[in-house]
Regions:
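OB-fold ssDNA-binding interfaces and closely related basic DNA-contact patches used
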Residues: 1-113, 120-123, 127-135, 191, ...
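Compact mixed alphabeta submodule
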Residues: 109-205
């Protein structure tokens, strides 16, 4: 596969354009989960994700600040959320429960990490994949692919769906080979929780 930039290695719903739909195949059905929050570098204000293993309760402010180590401060909320008592630009952005899956993006023809931090999307994934039709799975061995559509109209709405995959044995074999090669090369999605790069677990430059 061609070299891809780090941005191409992740499918993040909030990065989709308005009215964009992406189609992908799930490569492993069980997601990796973690708490995630963002910090801002106190020198140049660049953002960095800080991740924590999933426990019953989100990490405390003390745990977050300890992980940030003094060179980052907590990012502020980008939106008001009266239900959660969050004020845009004032309240610390709270940790969110994330779910990630390795996927094959059929539009970009590459393996990516699909990261979901939006409860509305995860709820749809859980509901759709729980249907009797998909009880044997929706991974590469199945006949299905998934779509995610983003629409901004006053607020952002995401629609997740499972659909019949266009039959193409050669393509599916190519995807399976790429996935096996990537795993042999050390791909490790659990690295995300440890602050590492799943595509480069050894940290090679």
């Amino acid at each position: 596969p061609e070299e891809t930039s780090s941005g191409d290695r992740y499918l993040r719903p909030n990065k989709l354009d308005n009215n964009q739909e992406v189609e992908f195949i799930v490569l492993e059905e069980d997601p990796v989960e973690y708490w995630q929050t963002f910090g801002e570098n106190i020198v140049d204000q660049t953002a960095k994700a800080f991740r924590f293993p999933v426990t019953a309760e989100p990490p405390t402010n003390e745990e977050i600040l300890e992980a940030m180590g003094g060179s980052f401060r907590r990012s502020k909320c980008k939106f008001d959320n009266p239900k959660q008592g969050l004020v845009k630009g004032k309240t610390d952005s709270p940790p969110v429960h994330c779910y990630v899956w390795p996927i094959y993006n059929l539009d970009k023809n590459c393996i990516q990490v699909f990261e979901v931090s939006q409860p509305s999307i995860f709820k749809q994934i859980k509901t759709k994949t729980g249907l009797k039709k998909y009880r044997k799975g929706i991974d590469l061995d199945s006949e299905f692919s998934c779509t995610l559509h983003k629409l901004e109209d006053g607020y952002t709405k995401y629609t997740f769906d499972v659909c019949d995959r266009e039959e193409d044995e050669k393509r599916d074999e190519k995807i399976a080979d790429e996935w096996e090669t990537l795993k042999k090369d050390g791909f490790d999605i659990d690295q995300l929780v440890l602050g590492g790069d799943p595509f480069n677990p050894e940290g090679d430059s």
